[in-house]
């Protein structure tokens, strides 16, 4: 991480970039958040570790409107999203200085919790340069351990590859983390009867609280005016009156991003209800392939 910080300082100092788009520590040790850094001094708060799962491509839509270049840190999977945004003329390539950062798979705190690990105070082994295959977790109940691969986000188990598709320079090495078939879960759903499919999606979508996190984080949801914010009909409201509205929001959103979704998995990562929203988009992908 220090190499990345040093390079960012150099690019700020010589005027190549006006700001850096990366991550800073959040309120919890496993919750870093996207952040801008405009001075060398501010980079003391920069972090990059296994919990930096956020895809920063979408932030470049607004950054492209600012004066000067923005240094943006992109993981291999993020570069697919950035390329798609270039095709749609939503980001300005000339306003971006892309550093392709190494990735050994990003971590999902919920997968750690599902192993019965609670009361987390700190986690070691998540550093990007750390080759450790085990996370050491300090909790209020004592020290716990967890295999790194068992704590990875679902999208990392079906990784599209460790190569960056667009960059100005690379810092850090990436690891091939794929150990599962990308469409296995979709094929399981495809094998269900119509009644079983309906029951599956009904059970998942009934958990939705319409927080709009999936839409807000999605690089493919880049319309200047979203249909769901329209005041001409009731879709702008947060609460769902009935199950039809629950389905309408997600099905329409899936149709809107069909053919442009890069399967970055951000929708599922940020969902506070744990809904596997990426399965909708993968269903469209497998349908197009057939």
Residue spans of the language-model regions?
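Active-site-adjacent beta-strand anchor residues
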Residues: 72-75, 208, 270
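Iron-sulfur-associated redox domains of electron-transfer enzymes in respiratory
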Residues: 1-201
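Residue-level marker for well-ordered alpha-helical positions
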Residues: 5-6, 202, 212, 255
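A generic structural-conservation signal
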Residues: 21, 95, 217-218, 270
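Ferredoxin-type iron-sulfur electron-transfer modules in oxidoreductases and energy-metabolism complexes
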Residues: 178-206, 220-288
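Short Cys/His-rich metal-coordination motifs, predominantly Zn2+-binding knuckles/fingers
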Residues: 159, 211, 264
């Amino acid at each position: 991480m220090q190499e990345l910080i040093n390079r960012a300082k150099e690019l700020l100092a010589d005027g190549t970039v006006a700001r850096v788009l990366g991550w800073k520590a959040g309120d919890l040790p496993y919750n870093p958040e996207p952040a801008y850094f405009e001075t060398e001094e501010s980079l003391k708060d920069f972090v990059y570790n296994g919990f930096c799962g956020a895809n920063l491509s979408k932030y470049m839509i607004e950054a492209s409107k600012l004066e000067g270049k923005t240094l943006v840190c992109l993981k291999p999977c993020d570069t697919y999203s950035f390329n798609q945004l270039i095709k749609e003329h939503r980001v300005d390539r000339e306003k971006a200085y892309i550093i392709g950062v190494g990735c050994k798979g990003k971590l999902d705190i919920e997968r750690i919790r599902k192993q019965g690990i609670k009361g987390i105070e700190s986690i070691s082994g998540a550093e990007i340069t750390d080759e450790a295959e085990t996370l050491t977790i300090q909790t209020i109940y004592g020290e716990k351990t967890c295999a790194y691969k068992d704590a990875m986000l679902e999208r990392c188990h079906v990784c599209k590859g460790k190569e960056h598709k667009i960059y100005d320079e690379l810092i850090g090495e990436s690891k091939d983390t794929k150990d599962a078939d990308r469409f296995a879960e979709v094929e399981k759903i495809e094998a269900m009867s119509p009644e079983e499919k309906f029951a599956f999606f009904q059970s998942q979508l009934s958990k939705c609280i319409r927080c709009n996190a999936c839409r807000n984080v999605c690089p493919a949801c880049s319309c200047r005016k979203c249909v769901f914010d329209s005041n001409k009909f009731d879709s702008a409201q947060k609460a769902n009156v009935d199950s039809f509205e629950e389905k309408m929001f997600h099905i329409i959103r899936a149709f809107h991003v069909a053919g442009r979704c890069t399967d970055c998995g951000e929708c599922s990562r940020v969902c506070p209800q744990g809904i596997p929203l990426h399965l909708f988009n993968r269903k469209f992908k497998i349908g197009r392939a057939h």
